[in-house]
Amino acid sequence: MQFPVDTHSHTVASTHAYSTIHDYLAVAKEKGIRLFATTDHGPAMKDAPHFWHFVNLRVLPRIWNGVGILRGIEANIMNEKGEIDYFGEYLSELDLVQAGFHEPVFAPADRLTHTRAMIATMESGLVDIITHPGNPAYPIDVEAVVGAAKACNVALEINNSSFTASRKGSEENCLAIARMATKLDAQLVMGSDAHVAFDLGGFDRSLAIVDAADYPRQRLLNESPMALLHFLQQRGHQHLDELIRYFRPVL
């Protein structure tokens, strides 16, 4: 099954990734992906794009050859206060703000520190999705984090790359998060975390976790473009009208 939405991809602007926006559009069209987000790493990462890269995402078309593009970022959680490395009025210009722990920016500490930082990030109201929360390098209090995600209407990502290319050993933590999300009816999303266009929409390992946790597939934000757009609209994003008009079902 090919889900039509992917919330997590990196372009050559993050120099450890290998594809352009044009590459992603071509693969999306080929695979039947209708909406994807370009979410390069926040500027605190050493090989991340400059702050201006995210400001200038406004030059991207909303829709190209039938594929919708969301202008986003995978920001870095900077500290225990939940601060991220993209801020101010420019945040409101983005369609999707994700954030997660990355070793070069936030050194692994202890379970309490990670939990506090992740919850503070969600409570800030600035972040829509927490990326790869099951990273074994950053153990968390799963019930506390998922409970906060539910309370803050923030989605937790089941990151497919965590089972293939990076963050080895994530399965147990991700399954625990997904099971708690099922129990608490918290919002999950699958992200390919593609660093090359061929991986866009690749969710096979993430979906296995979702299914093992008995989380309803129809609850995933990947289920349809409107599912994600409605979530982002609820979260206060105000520049989605063109995409909503395009993807809204005709009655």
UniProtKB/Swiss-Prot annotation:
SUPFAM superfamilies (alphabetical): PHP domain-like
EC number, UniProt record: 3.1.3.-
InterPro entries given in the database record: Phosphatase_YcdX_put, PHP_dom, PHP_phosphatase, Pol/His_phosphatase_N, Pol/histidinol_Pase-like
Cofactor: how and how many bound: Binds 3 Zn(2+) ions per subunit.
Annotated GO biological process: bacterial-type flagellum-dependent swarming motility
Entry cofactors: Zn(2+)
Binding residues annotated for Zn(2+) 3, in chain numbering: 74, 102, 132
Binding locations of Zn(2+) 1: 8, 10, 74, 193
Keywords carried by this UniProt record: Hydrolase, Metal-binding, Zinc
Family, per entry: Belongs to the PHP family.
HAMAP family reported in the protein's UniProt record: YcdX_phosphat (MF_01561)
Name of the protein in its database record: Probable phosphatase Sama_2233
